[in-house]
Design a protein with these regions (language model features):
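General beta-strand structural signal in soluble alpha/beta enzymes
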Residues: 17-21, 26, 73-74, 112, ...
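Acidic-glycine-rich active-site phosphate/pyrophosphate-binding loop
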Residues: 6, 11-12, 114-122
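Adenosine-phosphate binding glycine-rich loop
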Residues: 121-150
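Short glycine-rich anion-binding loops that position phosphate/pyrophosphate groups of nucleotides
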Residues: 1, 96-98, 116-117, 134
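Conserved active-site and cofactor/substrate-binding residues in soluble primary-metabolism enzymes
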Residues: 1, 28-32, 86, 131-141
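Glycine-rich phosphate/diphosphate-binding loop of Rossmann-like nucleotide-binding domains
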Residues: 25-100, 105-109, 118-122
Length: 150
């Protein structure tokens, strides 16, 4: 079964995760990550690398670019993950495992959307069965607002 088949079975009226192929906007985890970066003033004129190319971060890269960040998207086929992550202001790891060399220094903000980066000062957002703390908080907020409107 593929993603399109599963997501097409979800009724749009009941969908709060914005994880439907016809849903406009970003996924919950992307929205929460963007909100964190905006709150910390880490978007405008910053160098950001996203490691991962999944559905959850595709729109995040677009919105970061619209916020005047320079965005690099790296993935398993990137020739030099080390070079792609070197000397960045923010590195977002949106992949369950890191299998290649990575680089970060003390000025980097590392956001690990899994639990795969050995950075001592990272914002770690571990997830169980693909659901992390950022996603849960945004989903609960959306559900509460939706219930309040009905």
């Amino acid at each position: 079964m593929d993603r399109e088949t599963v997501s097409s079975d979800i009724k749009l009226a009941a969908e709060v995760d914005i994880d439907h192929s016809y849903s406009p906007g970003m996924s919950s985890v992307s929205q929460a990550t963007l909100a964190l970066l905006l709150a910390l003033d880490l978007v405008h004129a910053k160098d950001i690398t996203i490691v991962g190319r999944g559905h959850a971060v595709q729109n995040l890269a677009k919105y970061l670019t619209l916020g005047n960040a320079t965005v690099t998207v790296a993935h398993s086929k990137t020739k030099s993950l080390l070079q792609a992550t070197m000397n960045r202001d923010v590195v977002i790891y949106a992949t369950p495992t890191i299998t290649k060399d990575i680089s970060y220094n003390t000025r980097d903000l590392v956001i690990d959307l899994g639990n795969s980066v050995p950075h001592p000062d990272r914002f770690n957002c571990p997830y169980v069965n693909r659901i992390g703390q950022l996603t849960v908080s945004v989903l609960l907020n959306r559900f509460a607002r939706k219930e309040h409107r009905t």
